Amino acid sequence: MPSSPRNRRRRTCVALLSVAACIPARAAVAQERQDSVVELSRSTLRVGDKTIRVLLGRVVTGASVAREASFGSATWNGRRYRGSLDFVTDGDGVAVVNRVDLEEYLRGVLPGEIGSRDPRDRAALQAQAVAARSYAGARMGEHRPAYDVTATVSDQVYGGIAVERPETDAAVRATRGLVLTWGDRIITAPYHSHGGVMTAAPDEVFWRRGNEPWLRPVDDRSPDGGCYCDASLMSVWERRFTTEDLRRLIAQYGRDAGVSLSGDVRNLRVVSRGPSGRVTVLEVETSAGRASMRGNDIRFVLRTDGAILPSTNFALEMSGGVAVVRGMGNGHGVGMSQWGAIGRARAGQDARSILAAYYPGTRLSPLQ
């Protein structure tokens, strides 16, 4: 029998939606200069011990706030959510938090995270359901005061009822209650779009954190010599930055990455790479000196049209005042590659095999 995880006191997920003043059945929400309306259904939701709290948004307001509970669904800013809304005050204002059954929450997560897929990708969808449930379950075990997860890429993208799809709903049902565990602990199961030839160890990317035994570089090459991720349109990419682009980007975003240099950019240099080949340290030389940025911070500095760099798995060439960055993959690279999972599903692997490949040493356990 699979072991049962210990962090199982509650299974209700809370999502932050926004700040609001509450009125029976309707609540007006002020967001910047725009008025929004929260409409609450009058049906009753039985909130059990598998409810997660999802943060959907935040509005700073001086309005008085009341907590709403025991509603079947709610609409905020034109988007419907299952469960109920909590209006929570904290130091940042008032937060609208969606309290929803964990399995219902996943129905609003999978479409935004892995998209609508055809039947041959069924095993990948099931693997995604387990990974997303594990991620949420681990967050729920942290006992945050107001909410468990946000509804954005900071945690997992959650779109509510409008995004639900039959194929992703089926994946949630097929894996109901299953999470990944290490010993008696639910693991935080990160995932990303496309890992390239090899996924990353956490300290290659999230260098401020330590490694975990179930997260290590995984070779994603298939037996035919290709890569399981090859169906992705982001297998390879190229970005170009002039020295003026670099000066502007470093001035705007560099401080958060530990680069506070001013002046003209003279050079970018890869100092080190991790086991997966990703750039772990990138040196910037300007007329004012040198400084380095590390791991995933690099992606948030080297932006084009506001979009961060697809990954840190790249080669760099400086020529004629232009930095040419050629890379592969999309996302941080840690944990399960979603396109790799799709490729493995199309090659005949089931969800259990896919999860074992990307989270080695873990077990599938029932959430109780």
Task: Give names to the regions the model predicted.
Residues 2-368:
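Conserved, single-site charged/polar hotspot
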